[in-house]
């Protein structure tokens, strides 16, 4: 049994650990409902690069700390000019270029807007009894993404 922590975002916004061939990635901004800022996007991208690169890793699991999976984009960070998209992998370091190996979204609590996009970019979803999904931007006629319903 192997278990090791890997460094990710310097701020601790993304936590990464390995356990028995599984890369466990935690979005760690519970006070902000795990909203995606620049550090989260970069941290997830680095974690998924590690998943693709390391042969002993077979699968990734992505989840959120606290009571929400992910509330979507951090609008304060976006308004402050933070780069929310990773140049290689897109929004949240995942949406435009998911990893080659399977990625499971472990959802408990809310997955809203961009958080729901993250779920859709994963290969599999496991949802707890408290999982809730939504696209609140639709009510405001805001749609900035084209959904990919099939994987390549």
Residue ranges and their predicted role:
Residues 25, 62, 74, 118-120:
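Hydrophobic/aromatic residues within transmembrane alpha-helices
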Residues 38-39, 73, 117, 147:
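Generic recognition of short, well-ordered alpha-helical segments
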Residues 90-98, 106, 112-152:
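CoA-thioester-processing core
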Residues 32, 64-99, 111, 139-141:
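Glycine- (often His-adjacent) and acidic-residue-rich active-site loop
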Residues 1-65:
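Conserved CoA-thioester-binding segment of acyl-CoA-metabolizing enzymes
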């Amino acid at each position: 049994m192997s278990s090791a922590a890997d460094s990710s975002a310097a701020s601790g916004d993304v936590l990464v650990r390995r356990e028995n061939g599984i890369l466990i990635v935690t979005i760690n901004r519970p006070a902000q409902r795990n909203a995606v800022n620049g550090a989260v996007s970069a941290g997830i991208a680095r974690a998924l690069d590690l998943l693709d690169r390391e042969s002993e890793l077979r699968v990734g699991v992505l989840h959120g700390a606290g009571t929400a999976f992910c509330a979507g984009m951090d609008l304060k960070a976006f308004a402050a000019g933070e780069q929310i998209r990773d140049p290689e992998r897109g929004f949240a370091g995942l949406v435009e270029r998911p990893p080659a190996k399977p990625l499971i979204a472990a959802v408990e609590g809310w997955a809203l807007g961009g958080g729901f996009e993250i779920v859709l970019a994963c290969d599999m979803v496991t949802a707890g009894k408290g999982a809730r999904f939504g696209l609140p931007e639709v009510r405001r006629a805001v749609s900035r993404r084209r959904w990919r319903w099939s994987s390549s």
